[in-house]
């Protein structure tokens, strides 16, 4: 990741989509080197450079390595975000960011982002797009997965069949989604912000788990996309889909955590790597 080039963008506009979600539209010269992805879970790495860092004096080409000689406190934090939409004609990228009050890096930045404010990013990456060969589609996640789920729903053919489950704090956090007529979108309420609700509404007890595991399983080959809080997804929903429902890895490869309650992204990445190594050792 350190050697990947950084694209220089700036904030074009912001808009609140819900109490806990802000859309930030990015544009500028960075689009000259940014190549959009065809995946509906396309993601970028936002690089938050302090205003007092003179980027023009850093080694070129500009990568994360360019910041290596700065004091630790001045090295930019990096956060992974899903691309909601790319408007190639307007040369703009829309990124929908979940707000967690004053906590975190991306949320406070998005809440206070101003037009013309610079931001650097790497990417995009991605690995999932709904397979038209599937008989039906199962999509599920919390707020962090809404951009990818929304993009996937829009990419489905008009005659697609499926179910989507999205866990949010409450009714005010629902946003408008476009889906084929035969794809049922279900909003699941947890009763509060994901990082603040009691333990009996999070992790192994997240309402999303019950919503997915109690829904009627449709006939035919399913293509699965499930992302969100890691404990709920990786220790509950992934075993349910792969083991209990017997869905082959080809059709259920995109089931993973986007974040983990009580951990920063740096801590989460470390935990996720350790989990992958442990799972690899059991096979």
From Swiss-Prot:
GO cellular component: plasma membrane
Annotated ranges, domain FAD-binding FR-type: 4-131
Pfam assignment, any one: SIP
Gene3D superfamilies found in the cross-reference section: Nucleotide-binding domain of ferredoxin-NADP reductase (FNR) module, Translation factors
Spans through the membrane: none
Entry-linked PROSITE patterns: FAD_FR
One GO MF term: ferric-chelate reductase (NADPH) activity
GO BP: cellular response to iron ion starvation; iron import into cell; siderophore transport
Domain of life (superkingdom): Bacteria
Name of the protein in question: Uncharacterized protein Rv2895c
Organism listed in the record: Mycobacterium tuberculosis (strain ATCC 25618 / H37Rv)
